[in-house]
Amino acid sequence: MTNNNAPRFLVIDGYTRAAREELQSGGASVAADLYVGMLERCGSAGTECDVIFPADPGASLPAGAAIRDYDGVAWTGCSSCVFSGEPDVAVQIEFVRECFRQGVPAFGSCWAAQIAIVAAGGEVALNPNGREMGIARGITLTDEGRAHPLYE
């Protein structure tokens, strides 16, 4: 945790380097940049954000940093699929498990939800209608989900 009143976040961008380059070549922003911008705009003065790209070979936390040093983790969406069998997927699932073990609050959407579910021992199923991007339909909350503070 930070020693001052300003929060320190770890932004984890799950896109592969090739996927990030493809986004940029098409004029889109890299997901991590969007998350950092939002956290800095909405956070208190002095909010700090570190970014890692765990799909990149050799990716690691900044020198001297540990997951427990962060006030929160924000995990971006990405174009990967939990079913791909790619080595970077397994690395990211294990990173989520470590975040869970450390007890650091985390937020994520889309891709982050898939790997968090798998990391926690749950199952993710292929959508029989194909991939959905940006909009998901027919999702219902369990009793546990409805009890989460987010929905109070």
PLM region spans:
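Short secondary-structure boundary/hinge segments and terminal tails
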Residues: 60, 117, 134-135
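Short, conserved acidic/polar surface loops in the N-terminal third of protein domains
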Residues: 84-87, 118-120, 128
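Catalytic nucleophile loop
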Residues: 100-123
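Pocket-forming structural segment of enzyme catalytic cores
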Residues: 14, 121-152
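N-terminal beta1-alpha1 cap of cysteine-dependent amidohydrolase-like domains
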Residues: 1-94, 98-102
